[in-house]
């Protein structure tokens, strides 16, 4: 994913604020996770998430993600 549109970024920020679930596709794998925070790592943005069943922390760099969908 090259960049998020303003609408997609607003949806992502809202999901983080509410602690909503996200469906993230990266390298052919689908992840359903709970959004926790948006972070900057140098010039790259990443999404800090947790797995809803195990509680394992997962980090996703936005520039490595194929698609992001907010589950309302």
Describe the role of every protein-language-model region:
Residues 25-32, 58-61:
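Short coil-to-beta-strand transition motifs
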Residues 60-71:
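Structured surface patches comprising rigid loops and adjacent beta-strands/short helices at the edges
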Residues 31-40:
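Short beta-strand-centered aromatic/proline hotspots
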Residues 1-15:
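Mixed-charge, Lys/Arg-rich low-complexity intrinsically disordered regions
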Residues 18-26:
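A short, Trp-centered hydrophobic/proline-enriched beta-strand micro-motif
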Residues 16-18, 32, 54:
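Residues that act as N-cap/strand-start positions at coil-to-secondary-structure junctions
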Residues 39-57:
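Basic/aromatic-rich interaction segments and small domains that mediate binding to polyanionic partners
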């Amino acid at each position: 994913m090259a960049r998020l549109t303003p609408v997609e970024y607003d949806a992502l920020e809202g999901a983080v604020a509410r602690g909503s679930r996200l469906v993230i596709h990266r390298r052919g794998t689908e992840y359903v996770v709970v959004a926790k925070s948006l972070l900057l790592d140098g010039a790259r943005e990443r999404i800090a998430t947790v797995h809803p069943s195990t509680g394992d922390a997962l980090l996703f760099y936005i520039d490595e993600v194929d698609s992001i969908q907010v589950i309302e």
